[in-house]
Amino acid sequence: MERTFNNNFGLSDNLPGGGNPISMDAIEEVQVVIAPFDVRQTNFIGGGINAITKSGTNTFKGSAYTYFQNQNMRGNSIDGEDLGARAKESKTIYGATFGGPIIKNKLFFFANVEVEKQPQQVIKWRARTEGEQPDENNYISRTTLSDMQKVSDFLRDKYGYDTGSATNFPADEKNLKLLGRIDWNITNGHKLSVRYNYTKNTAWNAPNANSMDGGSGSRLYNTSRVGYQSMSFANSMYSQDNKVSSVSADLNSRFSDKISNQLLFTYTDIEDMRGTNSSPFPFIDILAGKDAEGNQIMEPYMSAGYELFTYNNGVKNKITSVIDNFTYFAGDHKITAGISFEHQLASNAYMRNGTGYYRYSSLDDFLNGAAPETFAWTYGYNGVSDPKAQVTFNQIGFYAQDEWNIRPNVKLTYGIRFDDLIFDNSDLQRNDAIYDLDFGGKHIDTGKWPKSRMQISPRVGFVWDVFKDNSLKVRGGTGIFTGRLPLVFFTNMPTNSNMVQNAVVFGTKYENGIAVSHDSRLDQLAGGMITNVDDAIKKFGLPTTIENPVAGSKISGVKDNFKMPQIWKTSLAVDYQLPTSFPLSVTGEFIYNKNINAVTLENINIKDPSNWEHFNGADNRLIYPSDYTYVSGKNAVVLTNTSKGHGYTANVTINAQPVEDLNMMLAYTHTESKEISGLPGSDPVSTWQGMLTIDGPNFATVQRSRYVVPDKVIAAVNYNLPFRHKGLLRKTSLNLFYPVIPLPDIASLIQMI
């Protein structure tokens, strides 16, 4: 049974579930594909990993295992330079598998459970006690424990809010994996496999370091809410909770010697949400008061409350997929035709200050009920408590291919695939204020997705067994592959359309500690905080519906003719089994890639530079005029395509088994990749600005990819030590893995089964 888990949204580097969604001990076989010329495989342009999970047999089998790793099991030097004392760290994994027959030869089961624990200390700092002095070397903050106790008691007595501990900050990371599989031999010609797996990963974090709204900038003056100058409480921490639930059913049918069919259904529910131990309550920053001259000290002293970026912050992704492959065997031909359907919904919720935000000038101001110097709240329109940006689409694919055994030692595979991506516009609302902006004749419509466009992927591949004994094989092919784009780049459009939620900020601005402007509405908050959003809306007469939408400074869009990424791949490889007394093979492979529809970003508010001047001499960069934009103060960044970019990979791999139970591998890979942009981020404006250019992001040229590793060596050794004890077969495996030449760090792992 094959199933691929994708990080569809793309806000993190990890796979769904915060890592591997399935335990390695539940996997029977892993297939890595880089250039498969089988048209049944799609939705990737770099590579794909397919996993076949273990199944039960007629024999009851079980295993128990544990992994342990700490700071002493990794290297500690680079180029001969010792990095000093290693911070304490540990990771422990416990797991078990069990499988067997329910009805012999008919019905089988397999189950796996795995738990991973990593003790963490995300907050090393502590508040100082009476008689202590602040000490950076020993992580003692200037904030006093007695002041923290005053704030905690005050919030409990006046508002009924529990701040959590001021001295204990538990933050252990936990991961749970469950998998169950049933295999049913319905008849000799029909077999059904059903799998369910669940993964949950929880990792705790300290509150955001210094981001804020209002005031004289977007940061708390380059300091941190937890550190030498300031402390926070345990309930202001937040967790990153990653959950994956997936079920799949695979029905394989053989109707005759010439006709077979595979029907595969999968449903996956992925959630990456923030969690907290806090009840809903405003987040509070308390500044350090005033200096001897009466000027405001622009540094934090203490924070409390529901972490300001956690409420309704998360990504949800639901995928339903149905695939049917029909195969007909006609002599030397294996003809396959298929259809695939995928429905996908992705939502992104992000409400900074979703429970309210207050910033006070000093501890005394806060405790005595003075007006705050900043107030902020983000809330959903029409009473919606969990507003979110959403994208929904259906993908329909049709394909056909023929595997032709031209000769007993030559096989040719050729086929074609058609994929159509259809977006659902009902998720969107047009912001007329954005649409009315004229960017040199171009407009951004936040009320519709790109039009449906069929994408075609023809492919052809071959395998030639030169001597008809598998000792020398030549293989290769060429074709087009269609992939996906992280969905965060789509949800940026409704997120930045100002049609989802309303953000309110009342602030005070300072220059050198002296207030130069003050929002008078802050004075209405003297006497105590408003802790309910409905009360805040009523008190300040805030809008509850979208009355007069405005265009923000950051505008996101998707070009109407946008296409999912496509790449043309060509590969040639040679596999050679050397005539030795033990298995020894060498593989050489070369892959060339050329972009057809790569993805990049364009700021359509930038004017045509054809009439702009250049610097003189060697530095002939463009000189931007003062009126280089169509609309002042706006960034209008849209997703678009480019055909620029190419690359290649050359690899040599040696595999050997010099003695029984000893497997060795050595591989060298050289890679070159040129592109316009690797999309280094998730925010459209910052990603566009982060493009490496000479004349500006809109005029970027092809350059080496920032993600390419030009040269890499991998070596691996695996040795199995089987032994029997009281009739039970046990095995000890020793694995050594040497990852990359620039990082001489050998990690060892011992597994007891």
Language model region names:
Residues A64-N70, A111-V115, V194-Y198, L263-D269, ...:
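Transmembrane beta-barrel strands of outer-membrane/channel proteins
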Residues M1-G48, K54-S232, S239-K243, D257, ...:
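Acidic, glycine-rich flexible loop segments
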Residues D427-S457, G461-V638, I753:
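Solvent-exposed loop/turn elements at secondary-structure boundaries
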Residues I34, T53, G100-I102, W184-I186, ...:
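Residue-level signature of outer-membrane beta-barrel architecture
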Residues V39-T42, G56-K61, I103-K106, G189, ...:
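Short loop/turn motifs that connect adjacent beta-strands in outer-membrane beta-barrel proteins
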Residues S585-L728, F737-P742:
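Gram-negative outer-membrane beta-barrel transporters
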Residues I45-G47, T92-A96, L176-G180, K243-A249, ...:
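Hydrophobic, lipid-facing positions within transmembrane beta-strands of outer-membrane proteins
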